[in-house]
Amino acid sequence: MPDVVVAIAPFTQPTQTSELLSGFIPEGQKPIPAKSLAALDSLFRTKLHTDKHTYVFLSESDIRGPLVKDERGRRNALVTWAERARRAGADMIVVPHIVMLQERVGGEAGAVSAAAVNEDFYLIDARKPEALLQRSHFAEEQQSLVNDLTQIGSFFRRGGKWVSALELAGEGMDKAVEEIGL
């Protein structure tokens, strides 16, 4: 992605299928507090390599409004995000969706309930014709080492402790930054 301006949308939680770029909304989805969404936005900004691309960070007011309709008159999330990027003067846009964010119950040494996260990062080419170029998906619930020995690498990478939902989401952000080339 040389010499392109990349818009970064704030984290949103899709609650209707028309808002999704892919995937589905889980049954019994719980709303994610605005404070948590803001914390995710702040963390994601720190993960981006500002020497690689020119970034334009969109605000909540930049993305407010109904979905744009496509040529057939249907509400279309892809066209909507591309339009928001173009309005910001960007060639591409990264759209982070957080479908589920479950905070750990307990402390770092022991948890009654583990942190869990389900997030997607979409790279959309906003130039006509609009196109979804890439998706990075991260869905994980931390497991104890006793329950899942296959996760020993993650266990040691996390310092042998129970992580918060924000820390777990940060792992998904790292994955997206690498996969998408941000």
Predicted feature residues:
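C-terminal/domain-edge helix-coil "capping" segments
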Residues: 1-16, 84-88, 111-114, 118, ...
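N-terminal segment of the mature soluble domain
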Residues: 12-97, 126, 130-134, 166, ...
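Short, glycine/charged-enriched secondary-structure capping and boundary segments
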Residues: 21-23, 109-112
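Short glycine-rich beta-strand segments
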Residues: 99-101, 122
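Extracytoplasmic/secreted cell-surface and envelope-processing proteins
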Residues: 103-108
